[in-house]
Amino acid sequence: MDETLNVDTEQTLTCLTLTMYHPNHQDQKLFRGINFSRKEEIKADAVVAFGRDYNVCRYPLLSNRVSRIQFNLQFFKHFNCSTTAIEIKNLSKKNKLYVDNLELDYLNKIELPPKCMIRFGDFQILAVIERGDCDEKFEICCEKSHVSLVQDSFIPTMQPIPECGTLNAVEIDENEY
């Protein structure tokens, strides 16, 4: 009998890549507990915490401006669907968490889009999800950026262009037209 028929097909893991930036990224203590550029497998039922508490958080962010537990990530499967996703929940009472431009207060949670910017305090985290087909575990890979991930684009305000050549508004009686 052919042995290839008995071999399980290998499933790909969903991978969440988190590129992190902080203005004081040179400070060795800030990201000391995070192994950069290494994928870490995480069981699907695990809740992954980020924050200042080294004993509770799998990914410690050692800054006085970060809450003890800032936020957590959790892998889940949609109801009546085989696709998996990752949700983020703000666990900080003092710091708001922003996912793209959506503000999350304490205990608010949302599903992470495939690519988004997570911000709190001075931290910027670019999150990119590569979907896999395994629902038993997923991977997180952390990268460190030395440049800001948020680009402030200055767009000068444009002056409106009048349709009829006059720069000031002119009132016209509706019967005078």
From Swiss-Prot:
The keyword Electron transport does not apply. GO terms for cellular component: cytoplasm. Residues 48-104 form the FHA domain. It comes from the Eukaryota. CDD domains: FHA_TIFA. One of its GO terms (biological process) is positive regulation of canonical NF-kappaB signal transduction. Gene3D superfamilies: 2.60.200.20. Pfam families: FHA. InterPro entries: FHA_dom, SMAD_FHA_dom_sf, TIFA. The keyword Transmembrane helix does not apply. It is found in: Cytoplasm. Keywords: Cytoplasm, Immunity, Innate immunity. Belongs to the TIFA family. Adapter molecule that plays a key role in the activation of pro-inflammatory NF-kappa-B signaling following detection of bacterial pathogen-associated molecular pattern metabolites (PAMPs). Promotes activation of an innate immune response by inducing the oligomerization and polyubiquitination of TRAF6, which leads to the activation of TAK1 and IKK through a proteasome-independent mechanism. Interacts with traf6. This is TRAF-interacting protein with FHA domain-containing protein A. It comes from Xenopus tropicalis (Western clawed frog).
